[in-house]
Amino acid sequence: MVDTTKQPNTLLAGVIKKAGATNKGLARRVRLLSESDGGEPVRCDHVSVKRWLDGTTPQSRTCQLIARVLTELLGEHVSLEEIGYTELQNPDTGLEYPEEIAQSVMALGAITDRELRMPNRAEPLTVVPEAWSGLVVRWLTDSDHDRSNPPAEPHPITVVDVEAIREATAMFSSFDYKYGGGRPKTLVAAFLDQEVLPNIPHVSPQHPVGREYFREVAALTRLAGWTAYDTGAHGLAQRYLTQAFRLAKAAGDKALCGRILANMSHQANFLGHYQRAIDLARAAYKGANGHATPTTMALFYAMEARALASLRKEGDVTAALLTAERWLSQGSRENDPEWIHYFDLAELYAEFAHCYRDLGNAELANHYAAESIRESESTYVRSLSFCRTVLATAHLQAGDLDAALHVAKSVAETAMSLKSFRVISYLDDFRDRLSAHSEEPLVREFLDFARGVLPSEDSPVSRRLVVA
């Protein structure tokens, strides 16, 4: 904690009293919220609260959590200013939906600046689940007409500029698939910072080439969010994806808007916000229907199925998976945008496997995981690692311990060279599931091996902390 004042915080004391909270009760609620919102867990107790009341200002994240807890207790919004923390910067930069493109560019600049120039000095950004809900409402109710003003000093943009961004996105995506998001993450941010942000304020999406430029910038920004998500920088990812959505909307690309909402659904589900994940996936296919290709629609329904499986809604899961399968089987893929080319039968089978694992159906999880692996291209190393871990879990659910450990060990060997927080988290989940077999010699051998090659349980990656 940083002691910024010795004056008692009477504003905080007044709001705590109004909320009827005790020091112990407030500390407990702050701890619980910090462990469930996708950010770094905060350790505090009644002594910590006493220090806050005496005038010690905690870290920015803790101040935000205090305000959110008091908001919940009172049933009305409590700002940082109302509890005596007026000096803190707004951590929600990048989460607000900008009316003007210039505002989005400023937000994107702040995000890339944070990532590139102060990665170790800045406190981790937190995930704000309410921001997803606000975006869903905006997407489903907003006018199709973009209200952005034309640039004050327009610069000519050529097809070459558009192709340069498209090719950069393809290259960084290849790195992401093969080596994990940690490899291209800062490269994507640097490209945005150096090649895109200086130009985009002078480009109008009202012109055909300008619209294409915005579409490609949105796709690149989406990738920045996806690589951040894969490395566990959840707050950073949420902000990149929000701005990617705004840029895609400026380009008038409803299919890409849906794709970004589907990515948000994926992240929300990963962080345990299952209903919000369902809402995001449904918003994707409702808003993009008639504008997205069948392959893209299949992805949206697959994301809905995955979130429904987390809530154990078996009937709804089956319906969503069958709908995804029907969409994928419709017509050719010639009209698919480049960013959906990866989503093939192997990817859909992987989604089936994930869902059946979460529903506890070991037989079907095993079947679809094996089919996905058979159909997969070897270039998608990370996707294969996910699916093989699901297969290992399915073997474990079926009681085949030897097969489960054999597959999991091969994934752990691959994970050593992958810079992917999510792959590590899959293996952590598998290790947790082994607790019932902890006395088995083969299990002890595997756990010893895993400890030697994977991040320790105290590492930021293993504990699902935000590293932004």
Question: Predicted segment positions?
Answer:
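Short, flexible, glycine-rich and Lys/Arg-enriched loop motifs at helix boundaries
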Residues: 33-42, 332-340
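Basic/polar, acidic-poor N-terminal "presequence/leader" segments
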Residues: 134-166
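Conserved binding/catalytic microenvironments
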Residues: 153-468
